[in-house]
Amino acid sequence: MEDILRMLEEDGRLTPAQIAERTGRSEQEVAQEIKRLEEQGVIRKYQAVIDWEKAGAEKVYAFIEVKVAPQRGVGFDAVAQRILRFPEVHSLHLISGDHDLHVVLQGTNMKEVAYFVAEKLAPLEGVQSTGTHFVLKTYKMHGHIFPQEEQPGRLPVTL
């Protein structure tokens, strides 16, 4: 099972036949195992990693640290449930450290992200403070290394 999961995590487009060839199992056995993993929710989604800059789309990613006042009986979950419903929220994690929640937000520009933080996130009951960090460049995402464009060389420094 774990070998199938690793292969699909690396390339979600692999067919049961390709996986069967690599694992020495039958295609039918692999297909049944994948179906079982999907039904159990182990495999949640097949997703492409897209370089939006190369696609010519304007996308801005921001990491937002959120300090939350936990509520009795539910902790951080009540606030997290409200935050995850926003379509702009790409991912949401409970974290250790100085902040409680880590929000990855996708927007079309910095102004849109700022609006989300000021008008949607910060006013939520239980949110005490936020800190926003904009992604300036992506080197690796979901295990995929983004090739870097050749930058013009620096001029030599002479004294």
Predicted regions and their residues:
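A compositional/biophysical signature of low hydrophobicity enriched in polar/charged and small residues
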Residues: 1-159
